[in-house]
């Protein structure tokens, strides 16, 4: 069984046992989270597509940990003017393991 969920402005295709990194969610390691914005649920030829979400669809997951991604370096400059600006950014993420999918 698989599902397409929406979290953090992105969509993910997940099945039970998958480990994925999503945008930061509240919760410590070991906590349980529920994704109720399920866009599609499928098993073999039986597919339910939501409009926009599947009624009663739910995906549960366990939080494995919080972290920060690799640093992205940003630079801007103007030629011949001795103007340079450097900045860096590390996006926060939450690593989750999918524990259950229910079609509702």
Swiss-Prot record:
Family designation: Belongs to the bacterial ribosomal protein bL21 family.
Organism: Alkalilimnicola ehrlichii (strain ATCC BAA-1101 / DSM 17681 / MLHE-1)
Disulfide cross-links: none
Subunit structure: Part of the 50S ribosomal subunit. Contacts protein L20.
InterPro entries membership: bL21-like (IPR028909), bL21-like_sf (IPR036164), Ribosomal_bL21 (IPR001787), Ribosomal_bL21_CS (IPR018258)
Top-level taxon of the source organism: Bacteria
GO cellular component, one term: ribosome
Function according to Swiss-Prot or TrEMBL: This protein binds to 23S rRNA in the presence of protein L20.
Keywords assigned: Ribonucleoprotein, Ribosomal protein, RNA-binding, rRNA-binding
Pfam families membership: Ribosomal_L21p (PF00829)
GO biological process: translation
Name by which UniProt lists this protein: Large ribosomal subunit protein bL21
GO molecular function: rRNA binding; structural constituent of ribosome
């Amino acid at each position: 069984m698989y599902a397409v969920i929406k979290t953090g402005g992105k969509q993910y295709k997940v099945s039970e046992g998958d480990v994925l990194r999503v945008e930061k969610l509240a919760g410590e390691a070991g906590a349980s989270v529920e994704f109720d914005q399920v866009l599609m649920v499928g098993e073999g030829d039986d597919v339910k597509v939501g409009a926009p979400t599947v009624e009663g669809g739910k995906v549960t997951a366990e939080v494995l940990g919080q972290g920060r991604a690799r640093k992205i370096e940003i630079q801007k400059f103007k030629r011949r003017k001795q103007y340079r600006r450097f900045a860096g950014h590390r996006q926060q993420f939450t690593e989750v393991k999918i524990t259950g999918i229910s079609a509702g």
